Every structure is written in C-alpha cells, then in structure tokens.
Amino acid sequence: MEVRTRFAPSPTGHLHIGGARTALFNYLFAKRYGGKFILRIEDTDLERSSIESEKVIIESLRWLGIEWDEGVEVGGPYGPYRSTERVDIYKKYVDVLFEKGYAYYCYCTEEELEAQRQELLSKGQMPRYLGKCRNLTEDQKRRFEQEGRKPTVRFKVPEGVKIVVHDLVRGDVEFLSDDIGDFVIVKSDGIPTYNFAVVIDDHLMKISHVIRGEEHLSNTPRQILIYNALGFELPQFAHVSLILGKDRTKMSKRHGSTWVEQYRDQGYLKEGLINFLALLGWSPPEDREIFDMEYLIENFSLERVSKNPAIFDIDKLNYINSQHIKLKSLDELTQMCIPYFVEAGYIKEDEAKSKFEWLKKIVKSVYEGLDYLSQIKDRVDIFFNNEVKIEEDEAKEVLKWDHVKDLINVFENKIRQMNELTPEAIKLLFKEIQKETGYKGKNLFMPIRVALTGKTHGPELVEIIEIVGKENILKRLEFFKTWYN
C-alpha cells in the first residue's frame, strides 16, 4: 500500500503554529515511507474562507520547505483539490446515503435546535439531535417547505453501537453512537459539512493515514459511521497532542506569536522553526536537539509521537534558532539580514550590493548573540550613528572616572596619526596607549567604548573601530568631547 497523507486547512486566517506542526508531521511521514503528501483546501465555510488566506497558508508552507506532491496549484490525478469545487462529487454520495436509508431532510429551525439543546443541558444530558425529523411524512415536508424552511441533510446514526477509533498515537478510543445524535452532513445552502466532505475526499484521494490534531478526535466516530455506511475502507488515524503554553493552557496570542509568518517576519529561520515544530510532540531516536529536514525525514515515526500535550516554549525556540543561525555561512547570513538593515533605515536597498563586504563585518561582530534576525536592528545601531547618546546609567558612571578626558585625547591623537585601521594596527595602538598612560584592561577600554558607542557592552572594541572607520571615529570623538565638556 502506498502511503498517502494530506494537510487540509480551512482558508479562514493564517497558518497557525499547530497547523504547521500537523502539515510537517504529514509531510515527514509521507517522505519517510516513500509516499505522497497532498495539500487540499477545505473551504466549506463560505463566510469565513478567502483566497487571501489560502495564499498566506500556501506561502507559509512553501517558506517552511513543506512542498506537496499533489494538490492546489500543482494538480494531480484526484482533483479538484478545493472543497467548493467538489460539490457535485459530494452530491452523488449524499444520494447514495439517501438510497441506503442513512440520510434524511431536517427542517428544524435554529431556535428549535437551541431549545432542544437547553432542555438536554438542564437535565444534565449531553446535547445532541434527538431525531425529530427522522420519520417525516411527505405532507409534513411539504408544509415545512411552504413555510419557507430550507432543510439540512442529517446522517441517521444507528442506535446502541460502540465505535472504536484505532489510533496510532492513542491506542483504541471508544465512543457510543447514542452520545452522538444525528448530525448534519449538508447545510441548508447545499454545501456539505466538514465531517462529510472530509470522508469523501480522503477516500477518493486514497489517503492511507489521517494525521491531525487531537481536537479532531471527537469528529472521528462521525466520520467512521459515514465510511461504514458508504462501504469505504477506513484510513489509519493518528491524533497528535494539543500544543499548550508554558502555563499549560491552550496556546494563544498571550503565549507569543501564533502564526508562521509572524515568526518569518521576526527573522526566525525556516530551519530553526521546522526543528522546533518537530519537537512539539515527537522525540528523536538519539539524544540531540538540533537537526535539519533531511534528518527528520530519515528518522520520523509515529511510534515516537507522544500523546501528552506539547509545550510551546519560546526560550527553547530561541535557543534552537540561534544554533541554526550559527550554522549559516557569513555570506548567507548577511544576505538574510539586509532587509532588517533597510527596514531600520541604516542603508538603502540599492546600497546593499556595494556595501556587502562592510555589512558582512558588522554581521560577523554580532551574530553569535542573535536568537532571531530582526534583533540585529538594535545590536548594530552603534555602527551607523555618529552622534552617540549616552543614556545607560552604567555608561554615565564610567564617565565620572578622573582619567576619561585625558585618555580620550590620547586616543584621538593616535587615531589621527594612523593611515589604516586594521585589527593588527588597532591592537598595536592599544599597546602604545597602555604604555604611554599606564591604563590597562577595563580602565583603558571602557571609556573608549562608551565614547564611541554610548554603551558598556557590545562587540569587540577592535571590531567596532575597524568597521566604523577613521573618519567616523573622529566625528564621534568630536561629538563626545562637545557633549562631555
């Protein structure tokens, strides 16, 4: 049997972190076993679905490196791959259910259904449809239609049946049909519901494994009933755990960004995010945390997927991403940082090429401390601003030292005499100043650092002086002396 998995998002918003994790697990499982991964768009929610959302989801998947073998935009033998383009296909199978006695028209209004729901709740019972329209006569149906009622189609759930979901992550999970009640499979506008469409699509697209979030587990018995009624073979189900925040509540905006493109725009690398997403519920067969897509494809299995909730830990994501930043070549990293230099107004877009080597030196001096690339905007302002503001309390304390003025004058005079500021020449310069003034270590370097950057911490002072260059160093010292005096 060929392994065929799918990711079937509703285009009603952005690609959520949970959705991205589901897509990744499906992709990895298919690739691990030489199968096919399919992307299907479930746009049956006409009010909330949009082409814009679909584009955002597709862009996010492609950015992550999750490519599909069949589906929207790439085609395939079992299309179309949007639910709204498959309505005629669904209608055929609704007719089959009517013929077999598994479907009926329901004319209940929203108000009637809500009243029934409240009555069951008041009795401490689980809300479900009690089958009021199950056995309507043709006359009753006609009367309802004359009143202007538009019917839904409901699935007739057999009574007293135990439904077992054989789950590859959770083991066997049992449900009772009496707790489910007859459920809607076609809405009053003629569009099928998710629970019906997903069965038809998964069957016709020959999906072998349905890997999805735990929140879909309660839908599965309904889907199994439809599979059985139509005589379809069941796929294998695997329901992966929920993603919770560190406080063990459902992940939401208060736990940080929840959409993939928010992380992309902040400058998280796709390699870092993929690595982190894989660890939300799956554990590698060896003791390691940093790996690439190739490793994941070779090692992913559902046996190593936990049924316990996955905890979204932003500190762990930052650590993993920082390790992937360090794995990039300096050229690659610089190229990736250019949009943030432009965004901060440090350079114009058309200057990036001519200033590339200089920008590379800047990136080299700060990249080791980065968790994500947009942080670079705040780390590199010291290279672009000659009018240095001294606002840190720690920096102001340094300026109270008695020898600051004399030391800065000596430093300025030495810089003026230098032809080029290479790392070797700058190190030699500091040795000369130390010999001449007697100051060394913190007493030598800290006042110069504060005068040039306004800060007490940052990249190596030698790197700062080389990158800023003689002309700008002198401008900074002039500005500093005016401010200091």
Curated annotation (Swiss-Prot):
GO terms for molecular function: ATP binding; glutamate-tRNA ligase activity; tRNA binding; zinc ion binding. It is an enzyme of class 6 (ligase). ATP binds at residue 253. The keyword Nuclease does not apply. CDD domains: GluRS_core. A motif ('KMSKS' region) lies at residues 250-254. It catalyses: tRNA(Glu) + L-glutamate + ATP = L-glutamyl-tRNA(Glu) + AMP + diphosphate. Keywords: Aminoacyl-tRNA synthetase, ATP-binding, Cytoplasm, Ligase, Nucleotide-binding, Protein biosynthesis. Its EC number is 6.1.1.17. A motif ('HIGH' region) lies at residues 9-19. It holds the Pfam family tRNA-synt_1c. Gene3D superfamilies: 1.10.10.350, Glutamate-tRNA synthetase, class I, anticodon-binding domain 1, HUPs. InterPro entries: aa-tRNA-synth_I_cd-bd, aa-tRNA-synth_I_codon-bd_sub2, aa-tRNA-synth_I_CS, aa_tRNA-synth_I_cd-bd_sf, Glu-tRNA-ligase_bac/mito, Glu-tRNA-synth_I_codon-bd_sub1, Glu/Gln-tRNA-synth, Glu/Gln-tRNA-synth_Ib_cat-dom. One of its GO terms (biological process) is glutamyl-tRNA aminoacylation. It is found in: Cytoplasm. GO terms for cellular component: cytosol. Monomer. Catalyzes the attachment of glutamate to tRNA(Glu) in a two-step reaction: glutamate is first activated by ATP to form Glu-AMP and then transferred to the acceptor end of tRNA(Glu). Belongs to the class-I aminoacyl-tRNA synthetase family. Glutamate--tRNA ligase type 1 subfamily. This is Glutamate--tRNA ligase 1. It comes from Caldicellulosiruptor saccharolyticus (strain ATCC 43494 / DSM 8903 / Tp8T 6331).
